[in-house]
Amino acid sequence: MKRVFIEKLDEWSKKSNRKPLVLSGARQVGKTWLLKEFGRLHYAQTAYVNFDRNEPLKALFKGSFDITRILTGLQAESGVRISAKDTLIIFDEIQQCGDALTALKYWCEDYPEYHIACAGSLIGLALQEGTGYPVGKTHSMTLYPMSFGEFLCAIGEEALLDVVQSGDAALVNAFAEKLKPLLKTYYLVGGMPAAVQAYATTLSLASAREVQEDILSDYNRDFAKHAPKIQVPRIRAIWKSLPVQLAKEDKRFIAGDVPTESGGKSRSRDLKDPFEWLEDAGLAYRVWNVTKPAIPLEGYRGRIFKLFGLDVGLLAAQSHLSPRAVMEGNRLFTEFKGALTEQYVQQELRASAGAVPHFWTSSDSRTEIDFLVEGADQVVPIEAKAEENLQAKSLKAYRERFNPRFAVRTAMTGLRVDDGLVNLPLFALPSFARVIQTDREDCRA
């Protein structure tokens, strides 16, 4: 497996004002593997400890934040002689020990020379429970499922990723017929590392689906294990509703479409806490509308949102989508009103471009832009479609009204730039970060 996130970890490790790192993300996105692999590649040794069901380790942080004393205990627990210069210290499942989270303040203030990297799947939930998180004393990052580019590397197609990232339209278009079926495969396999590994090893979509179903079962058990009892039925109802909501023509989330335990309709205020729980667990993301497409987008956040899942492959599994039935032609890209395509696009925007997408709808609801992201100094509108014959009427209306320097339309047609409109093939989304760094005159995917 190759995760480009390792490059971000390398940047963190070299900072002169480095703070302890807290890496969050949903369960099973590969946080532990990533930190261990980073330690293997960039440090002489790694001291790894896991707080899950480890009472002696938790006791080490009780009652005293004497870092010298804690270091002695960490060496005994990990079996590694820790050196500030060349040892990566990994605290796994740190949300299981609130005192260890609090202690990060003292590592930051008094022992900044040590390289501390923490991983936790439910850190957001731990904070809800009143853990003394050291605000301003850590560096936070979020790990998402493997992107399409990382998937290409995992199945031995790294050369095709180089093509996609070249920015050469003629070169990218020349390999379109090789990239399209691989993108179809990614829609079904997704980016959960275990599912990717299963497919890369067997080339079997069925093997990947078995892994996905196990992951979904694990998440369902997590609801009962970690969520407040009163919220569990509502969390499960939202989770079950997610594929149905995305399969609608209008993908805005409607609370009334989520059934209550008694079979009635849910109310928005009753779902507020369950939504936050799913987001804190990294299992779902709300993409909010904005009342005005201007920077900062979050400053113009409205009250309407679309709810997306963690991973396109998991969404396909939740939807019980038969791989055999949809691999022919381009049906997969448009199935369920393009639900998988929009899931893929927003997922890629987060994972590859580090963007936080929003969307915009005109006051008369006639024009909707699927996604807006912040570029270097402008809001970039994105129309996320899969059809090959696109009119992009909403994008045209948006451009006429707001005159952005450039806009992006995803499609299955070739890569090209025409008067500030970037036609970006869905399989070229791994290069999107380059798009938002440029002006329309020299815009290159």
Predicted segments with their positions:
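Hydrophobic positions on the alpha1 helix immediately C-terminal to the Walker A/P-loop
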Residues: 34, 38
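Conserved lysine of the Walker
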Residues: 31
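Accessory nucleic acid-recognition modules appended to NTPase machines
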Residues: 200-368, 372-373
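Structural recognition of the conserved hydrophobic beta-strand(s) that form the central parallel beta-sheet
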Residues: 90, 115-121, 142
